[in-house]
Amino acid sequence: MGQIRSILRGIAYDRTESPARVLRRVDQVLAGLQIGSMATALIARIEQTPEQARRGLRTLRWSSAGHLPPVLLRPDAGVQVLETAPERLLGVNATETRSDHSAELRPGDTVVFYTDGLVEHGRTGIDEGVERLTRTLGELQGLPLEELCDQVLGRIVVGRTDDDIAVLAVRCHPQNAG
């Protein structure tokens, strides 16, 4: 996993390519270097056109290699799992293309990314775990980000340490005029 992480960071560092293209390049490097590892990954970036800037909007663009979907929290519309068709893990096939996905972001929106260790444990399947996460996020969505993440971990993890667990939350703030 460490090799894959380093390759991904190196390729993504100064690229303007789409997230799907970055993941495809990682697949190609893994095949070319004959690294026999596989991993899930999700790469995302927040973009903004001049027109979106005038309107205070942004676009979340992401591509997933077998990773769980991000969750979008909207102050005025609740919680939405950004489900997409599943795609293969990194390191499985270097020749197939990957897909980009996008969602419009408004001021106040929060996007939450997480590892499977947060939602999958014991007899709880991934679907149940994601459902629990979305319910929890709905209850906590007005909190400052650090507190939101701490509360999510405190309510869902409950002493488990059998898998890696990570939560990352990004909130869109209103832009300054000028």
Predicted features, each with a name:
Residues M1-G2:
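Conserved long alpha-helical elements within nucleotide-processing catalytic cores of c-di-GMP signaling
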Residues R5-G178:
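Conserved subregion of the PPM/PP2C metallophosphatase catalytic domain
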